[in-house]
């Protein structure tokens, strides 16, 4: 695991059970000025998010302890402003149906950085589709 962020830098938490993937992602993102914290343990990821601000969670989908979709839900529950990007070597219906941005493994460094930048520059975090708002009283069909 790396050190906490320097003031002014955006912090990205990378969660992947493969140390080689974490090392590669770290190298690419640090070269582009991001502060990177990484772990192979989704439960440690949760503790990290509870302890400090994380701007973006980059998580593998297929992991032995907890899948990335479940981790994303748990992180969003405790830190709604943390943005999420999924990584996967598989493009399953569940991943596609999640509505979250996904980086396919193996990935190109430029694609990784572009996706991360786009998410961090966006104005809002991922929002699961919910029911439409209730109509206001007195404003029914005319």
Residue ranges of predicted features:
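Non-catalytic signal-transmission and effector/linker regions of two-component phosphorelay proteins
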Residues: 1-13, 26, 73, 81, ...
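Active-site residues of response regulator receiver
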Residues: 60
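Charged docking surfaces used in two-component/phosphorelay signaling
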Residues: 23-31
């Amino acid at each position: 695991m790396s050190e906490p962020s320097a003031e002014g830098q955006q912090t990205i938490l990378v969660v992947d059970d493969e140390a080689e993937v974490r090392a590669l992602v770290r190298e690419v993102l640090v070269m582009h000025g991001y502060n990177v914290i990484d772990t192979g343990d989704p439960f440690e990821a949760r503790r990290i998010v509870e302890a400090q601000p994380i701007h973006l969670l980059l998580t593998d989908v297929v992991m032995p302890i907890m899948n990335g979709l479940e981790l994303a839900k748990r992180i969003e529950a405790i830190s709604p402003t943390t943005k999420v990007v999924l990584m996967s070597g598989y493009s399953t219906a569940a991943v596609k149906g999640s509505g979250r941005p996904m980086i396919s493994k193996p990935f190109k460094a430029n694609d990784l950085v572009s996706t991360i930048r786009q998410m961090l520059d966006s104005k809002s975090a991922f929002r699961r589709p919910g029911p439409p708002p209730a109509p206001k009283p007195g404003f029914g069909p005319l």
